[in-house]
């Protein structure tokens, strides 16, 4: 489940895609997903993860809640084309026992994002964020866009961030 190092979902040592305004699903990951009807529907593409939520809409009493629970650990995120950070626990709407990759946070046949990776929470507070997505493989330069969105969020919700918040470059 997630962004492994090898196979169609990992970089296998090749790293990220070249810097771009947006990133589509890496070709080998997309092809592997198209071969799995519980991940990718030929008519509709990726289904939307039922827990996907814009991060500011997940704030409850100065912490994040996803599907009614306070996250404690890594959660998937994407920065969509509208400068919104979408977060969600791994939840496949077709088959809950199957994996739920980053493209399911936005859904569709050809999803594009500005960045994607993992946000780590401790008791619902943001601790760190990275660009580790085996499906989109965003360039680390794209993290600046994420940082800008988080700075705005921090300005209006300073207690949402852990005192140990750090920026993990990858």
Model-derived regions: residue spans:
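Intrinsically disordered, low-complexity regulatory segments
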Residues: 51, 59-62
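Intrinsic-disorder/low-complexity loop/linker signature
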Residues: 45, 83, 124-125
């Amino acid at each position: 489940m997630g962004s492994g190092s090898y196979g169609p979902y990992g970089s296998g040592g090749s790293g990220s895609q070249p810097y771009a305004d947006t990133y589509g699903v890496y070709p080998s990951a997309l092809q592997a997903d198209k071969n799995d009807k519980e991940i990718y529907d030929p008519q509709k593409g990726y289904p939307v993860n039922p827990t996907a939520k814009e991060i500011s809409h997940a704030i409850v009493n100065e912490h994040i809640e996803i599907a009614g629970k306070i996250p404690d650990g890594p959660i998937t995120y994407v920065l969509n084309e509208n400068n919104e950070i979408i977060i969600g626990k791994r939840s496949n709407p077709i088959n809950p026992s199957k994996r739920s990759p980053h493209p399911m946070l936005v859904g569709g046949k050809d999803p594009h994002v500005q960045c994607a990776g993992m946000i780590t929470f401790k008791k619902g507070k943001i601790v760190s964020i990275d660009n580790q997505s085996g499906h989109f493989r965003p360039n680390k330069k794209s993290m600046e866009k994420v940082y800008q969105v988080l700075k705005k969020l921090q300005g209006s919700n300073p207690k949402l961030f852990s005192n140990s918040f750090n920026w993990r470059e990858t």
